[in-house]
């Protein structure tokens, strides 16, 4: 039996109507006025009137004071992300196969040409978002990676974010945030190279800009507030479980944190600990986590582990931790999550920053049908085919007959023409021509 010991008071809202109106107006203005409109929004919204595209000299100057230890940590994380992305790249194989005597088909796997990577800057400096996008695109073999981040508190791109962009391999770095950044990358403003794919997290306006431009460019995911679910049984450490719930709640006021458990004792202890841990956070994180846990936190008690799987797959959380015995069983049975973190040793924060798999993940139930950002997002699987004249004997006849059944006479005649050319003295059953 499934019961709620704590139920969310709200459902995350992104104020979609408001965001749509604002974004529609901004995109129209940027399309009409180009760079001038972008500069206007940069000054109006971010207090930035400096250079948009940073030169190599500017990048060196602005990152020269980044401590060696910080550089080493960022470099380590980039290697982790790159190594995982390269392993993903190797899983994509090109092949050719003879499907019928004389009919050969295959696939090629190629990177897109231009990618735009966005890293937000608001409450926090999102260093990890900088290398998650850029390093993965570079591992895919993308020739041109354009990176954007908001001027941090009106002072230009945060030096640590800027270093992360550079170290991960960004070819162009622009001091732009929000809708104007997404539009500039999509339209190729300042670079002359419109992006094929735009990726990266952001607020509701960034998410709406990506949604609005989808089709003109590819995107990673339709992202909402960050989510975490923790599955825990009686073997779990309540203090660690509570810490991990709070660790994700600090993302923002609308970030859900869910506990699914078969242990009432563990649930009670976690619910007692969470407010204590939140109270000890710095002010910015404390305010966000307090609202997130109060309004969106849930604790769900299940009678069996099968019920836990049922509820977990229904929620399809962005991040899913498992603090239980028999981790292999959970790996085999859970099917809907953005990324899975098995065992107490594997906290979401490790995946958010350092471990290797990408942290740009589906939210709001989208993990039921999609995965997160990966090297695959930057790759195209292109098919090809070739056949001999002899192979067209059967292929041509079947094609003509099906085409005429569909009423597509011009299609059928492309087969007729070849059969007449290649086998002038032969007779074939090509179907009944469509009446003119």
From Swiss-Prot:
Any one Gene Ontology molecular-function term assigned to this protein's record: histidinol dehydrogenase activity
Enzyme Commission number(s) from the entry: 1.1.1.308
Annotated catalysed reactions: (2R)-3-sulfopropanediol + 2 NAD(+) + H2O = (2R)-3-sulfolactate + 2 NADH + 3 H(+)
InterPro entries: Ald_DH/histidinol_DH, Histidinol_DH_CS, Histidinol_DH_monofunct, Hstdl_DH, Sulfopropanediol_dehydrog_HpsN
Enzyme class per UniProt: oxidoreductase
Cofactor note (record): Binds 1 zinc ion per subunit.
Family the entry assigns: Belongs to the histidinol dehydrogenase family. HpsN subfamily.
Protein name: Sulfopropanediol 3-dehydrogenase
Source organism of this protein record: Cupriavidus pinatubonensis (strain JMP 134 / LMG 1197)
Taxonomic placement: Bacteria, Pseudomonadati, Pseudomonadota, Betaproteobacteria, Burkholderiales
Gene: hpsN
């Amino acid at each position: 039996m499934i019961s709620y010991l704590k139920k969310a008071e709200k459902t995350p809202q992104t104020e979609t109507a408001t965001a749509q109106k604002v974004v529609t107006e901004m995109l129209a203005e940027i399309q009409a006025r180009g760079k001038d409109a972008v500069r206007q929004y940069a000054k109006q919204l971010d207090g930035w009137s400096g250079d948009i595209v940073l030169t190599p000299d500017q990048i060196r100057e602005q990152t020269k004071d980044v401590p060696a230890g910080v550089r080493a940590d960022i470099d380590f994380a980039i290697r982790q992300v790159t190594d995982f992305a390269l392993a993903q790249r190797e899983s994509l194989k090109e092949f050719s196969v003879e499907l019928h005597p004389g009919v050969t088909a295959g696939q090629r796997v190629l990177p897109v040409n231009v990618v735009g990577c966005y890293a937000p800057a608001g409450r926090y400096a999102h260093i990890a978002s900088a290398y998650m996008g850029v390093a993965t695109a570079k591992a895919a073999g993308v020739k041109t990676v354009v990176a954007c981040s908001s001027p941090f508190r009106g002072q230009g791109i945060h030096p640590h974010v800027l270093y992360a962009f550079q170290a991960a391999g960004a070819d162009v770095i622009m001091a732009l945030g929000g809708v104007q950044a997404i539009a500039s990358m999509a339209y190729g403003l300042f670079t002359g190279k419109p992006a094929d794919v735009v990726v990266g997290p952001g607020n509701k306006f960034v998410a709406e800009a990506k949604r609005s431009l989808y089709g003109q460019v590819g995107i990673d995911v339709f992202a909402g507030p960050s989510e975490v679910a923790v599955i825990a049984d009686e073997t779990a450490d309540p203090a660690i479980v509570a810490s991990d719930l709070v660790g994700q709640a600090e993302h923002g006021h609308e970030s859900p944190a869910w506990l699914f458990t078969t242990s009432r004792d563990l649930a009670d202890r976690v619910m007692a600990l969470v407010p204590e841990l939140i109270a000890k956070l710095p002010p910015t994180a404390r305010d966000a986590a307090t609202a997130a846990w109060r309004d969106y936190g849930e604790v769900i008690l299940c009678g069996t582990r099968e019920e836990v799987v049922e509820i977990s797959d229904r929620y399809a959380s962005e991040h899913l931790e498992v603090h239980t015995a028999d981790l292999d069983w959970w790996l085999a049975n859970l099917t809907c999550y953005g990324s899975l973190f098995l065992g107490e040793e594997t906290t979401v924060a490790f995946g958010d920053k350092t471990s290797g798999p990408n942290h740009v993940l589906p939210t709001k139930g989208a993990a039921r049908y999609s995965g997160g950002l990966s090297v695959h997002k930057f790759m195209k699987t292109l098919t090809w085919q070739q056949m001999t004249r002899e192979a067209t004997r059967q292929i041509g006849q079947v094609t003509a007959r099906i085409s005429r059944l569909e009423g597509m006479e011009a299609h059928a005649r492309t087969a007729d023409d070849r059969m007449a050319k290649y086998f002038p003295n032969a007779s074939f059953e090509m179907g009944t021509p469509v009446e003119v």
